[in-house]
Amino acid sequence: MQPPVPGPLGLLDPAEGLSRRKKTSLWFVGSLLLVSVLIVTVGLAATTRTENVTVGGYYPGIILGFGSFLGIIGINLVENRRQMLVAAIVFISFGVVAAFCCAIVDGVFAAQHIEPRPLTTGRCQFYSSGVGYLYDVYQTEVTCHSLDGKCQLKVRSNTCYCCDLYACGSAEPSPAYYEFIGVSGCQDVLHLYRLLWASAVLNVLGLFLGIITAAVLGAFKDMVPLSQLAYGPAVPPQTLYNPAQQILAYAGFRLTPEPVPTCSSYPLPLQPCSRFPVAPSSALASSEDLQPPSPSSSGSGLPGQAPPCYAPTYFPPGEKPPPYAP
C-alpha cells in the first residue's frame, strides 16, 4: 500500500519548482506592499490638503500593507508557515474589501463634489487675512456676482472660494464644494482633485492585486518540499489467519495425512463408514495399507473431513443380530 499524503492538499514539488513558486509569491507580495505604501501616501496627502474635505482612501493601504508584511514573513518561514500565510490572506482579504469601498467613495466624491473647470480657468479667488490670524477665527464677507444679482459670502482666512459654484439666494446647498478651507492657494484644490482620482485608481489596483496575491499565497501555503515531507505512521502488516498458509510458512514442515476413518469390524445396526464400498475387515485393513493419501488432504494441507455416512448392515438369513448396546 502507498503511504498517505500528509495533508489534504499536500503537493509534492521538486526543490526547483518550490523555489520558483516562492519567488513568484515574493514578487506578488512585494508588489502589493509597494501599492499599499502608495495608497497610504496619496491618501494622507489628500486628506491633509484641506480642512473641510476628509479622505479615507488610505485605510485600505494600511490593511493591505500589514497583510503583505505578514506574507513576506510567512514565505520565508520554515515552521509555522501555514499559520502565518493564513493570517496574511485574512488581512489581505479585508484590505481588498476596504479598497473596493474606498475606490467607490473617492471616485464618486471627486466626480460629484469637486468641479475643476472654475479652478482651471482662474474664476476662483483665494482669501487670506495675513500673518498672525487664525483662519478658523477670523471671518470676512466677500461679494459674489451671479445671474440673479450679487450676494454676500462669509469666508474664513486661507480659503479658496468659487462664486460660480455658490447659489446666491438659494435655500438648497450646492452639490459641488464652493469653498475649500485651510489651503495655501487655489492650486491646492486642483492637487486635491488629482489626488482623489489617484487614490481611487490605486485602490482599484490594490483590489485586483490583492485578489491575485491571496490566491498565490493560498496555493503556496499547501506546498510541501520533498526534503521536509513526513509520512504518516506505517500501516501494520496484514495478518493472514488462514491456518493452511500459516502452517506452510514454516520451512521443512510436512503434513502427515490422517488415517481415513473406517467402519468397525463389529457389525452394528448403523455404523459410520468411509466412502468406499462395504468390504470385510481383513480386506479393508489391507486396502488401507496400500492406498496412498487422497490428493485433497495432502495438497491443501487440511485433514480430510468428509461427512460420515451411515449404511445399514445386512445379515445372512438365519443369523440373529447382536443385542443392542447403547
Swiss-Prot record:
Residue ranges of the region described as Disordered: 284-326
Composition-biased stretches (Pro residues): 305-326
Gene Ontology cellular-component annotations: membrane
Lipid bilayer topology: Multi-pass membrane protein
Matching Pfam families: FAM70
Family note: Belongs to the TMEM255 family.
Protein name: Transmembrane protein 255B
Organism: Homo sapiens (Human)
